[in-house]
Regions:
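Extended catalytic cores of very large enzyme megasubunits
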Residues: 1-160
Length: 160
């Protein structure tokens, strides 16, 4: 498939999961371009101007000696810059507050998995939900991750 990765399978995984589409050129990123995007977004921010460290990491990733978080490789760029939640594979939260629900929704919309606990010591902290609920309230949902999570928070807040 290409000359950058040792097997066609690795090339397929890179192209189908991690390579961004470059609209101007009508193609997907090559493996070195994906690595460079990750280095410029994640590594450069943490190593300041230490180009020796950046180059060592770049070479190690390109040669598959080390592998960074593939979620960070996939999301490096505007999405990761906006909110680093998308860089994580999974997260956890106890369901002990009504805000747990919209927080879980936001995290899931960022592409991160959410593990949760509904053990008695947690859910006993939640307020009781009324059996019947009537409301004329209209909730306007902004079509974004933040907007949907906020709307869920508003719906749940109406219950208490």
């Amino acid at each position: 498939m290409n000359n950058y990765l040792p097997t066609d399978y690795q090339s397929f995984i890179h192209t189908s999961r991690y390579a961004r589409w470059i609209e101007d050129e009508g193609r997907r990123e090559s493996w070195p371009e994906t690595v460079d995007r990750f280095i410029s977004q994640v590594v450069t921010a943490k190593t300041d101007s230490d180009t020796k460290v950046q180059n060592e990491l770049r070479d190690a990733i390109l040669s598959l000696e080390v592998m960074p978080s593939m979620r960070a490789m996939m999301t490096a760029g505007p999405a990761l810059h906006r909110d680093n939640t998308c860089a994580y594979n999974c997260s956890y939260l106890p369901v002990d507050d009504p805000k747990s629900f919209d927080e879980a929704m936001f995290i899931l919309l960022c592409g991160t998995g959410v593990g949760f606990s509904v053990e008695r010591q947690f859910v006993s902290k939640l307020p009781e939900v009324p059996e019947l609920f009537e409301s004329d309230t209209t909730i306007v949902v902004k079509d974004s991750k933040e907007g949907w999570a906020k709307a869920l928070r508003q719906v749940i807040a109406l219950l208490y």
